């Protein structure tokens, strides 16, 4: 069974995740993949590497999933994030949302991505073609 929430080193599988999103009540399915690209702010990127505090990341992702379902009236929601080295063109994160109508699924997927960047303890390091590395700005809001 494919989990609703995952933080893993293995490559992410969008088609497997899509299979758990099948729902006869949903008229819309949005499957967003955030992928490693070859540039950032004009610098050529070789690869990305993600680190996480996995137990808290999984907890925060589960809370985001619950809030997205409630806030947008989703029928289903899944969030998978990769950690470790992510080569160019491979998915670093997948957010899948389904709802009766498309607007809710699109809005929910965008909201989840924004919240991941703000709340979830997952950090991205970029390795550049010149051999240098840089942590990408990460600011998190933790709610107690």
Where are these regions (language model features)?
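N-terminal, polar/charged subdomain of small-to-medium soluble alpha/beta proteins
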Residues: 1-92, 102-110, 114-144
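Short hydrophobic/aromatic beta-strand micro-patches
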Residues: 96-98
């Amino acid at each position: 069974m494919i989990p609703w929430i995952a933080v893993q080193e293995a490559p992410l599988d969008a088609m497997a995740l899509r299979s758990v999103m099948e729902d006869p009540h949903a008229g819309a399915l949005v499957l967003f993949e955030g992928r490693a690209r070859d540039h950032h702010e004009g610098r050529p990127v070789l690869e990305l590497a993600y680190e996480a505090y996995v137990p808290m990341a999984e907890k925060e992702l589960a809370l985001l999933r619950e809030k997205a379902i409630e806030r947008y009236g989703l029928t289903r929601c899944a969030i998978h994030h990769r950690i470790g080295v992510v080569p160019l063109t491979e998915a670093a994160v997948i957010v899948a949302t389904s709802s009766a109508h498309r607007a809710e699924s699109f809005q929910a997927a965008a909201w989840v991505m924004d919240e991941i960047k703000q709340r979830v303890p997952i950090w991205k390091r970029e390795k550049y073609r010149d051999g240098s590395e840089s942590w990408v700005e990460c600011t998190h809001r933790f709610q107690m």
